[in-house]
Amino acid sequence: MTDHSIPRFCEHTGEALNAAALALVREATSAERVEQNAGKLPEDSILKKVPIVKLAPGTWKYVLIQLTRDGEDGAIVVVRSYAHCAFHADNFAACMRELKEELGGKGVRGRVLGGGRVRHDAESKRAFVYGYSKTFGRTPGCNERAAVIIEREFDGYETGWSDDGY
């Protein structure tokens, strides 16, 4: 018996295999409003409390997520990579669940801008971003943007990126 309330994805194609997975992908890619002014938030915005980068040590899938808040202009872009997430959409779901718990709901919405993999070595202060997301597709500039964000947020880190590989 399969639990259709748990998102399932194809290991080879990244395709959503059940209704829960399809709903998660739709949520992650929908944009009721698309913000082009990422980072220009009101001074009192709750989004200013959100860490811009969270990376698990090791090599894992990552997603680049644009966050907005209902009733506010502006947006932030965050990078998330969790060791417990097998799929890019799982990283999105984990981030949104975490934000809901930390911020108490507060009308925060997320939209996946892209994803790939990140090799993170905290000990040597290195991060390398590469590949793409089978679920969300190739997104030009995504890996470069993620690497720039990581380098900006992680002081003293050496970062690199490539669009090669999966």
Where are these regions (language model features)?
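Intrinsic low-complexity, intrinsically disordered or marginally ordered coil/linker segments
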Residues: M1-Y166
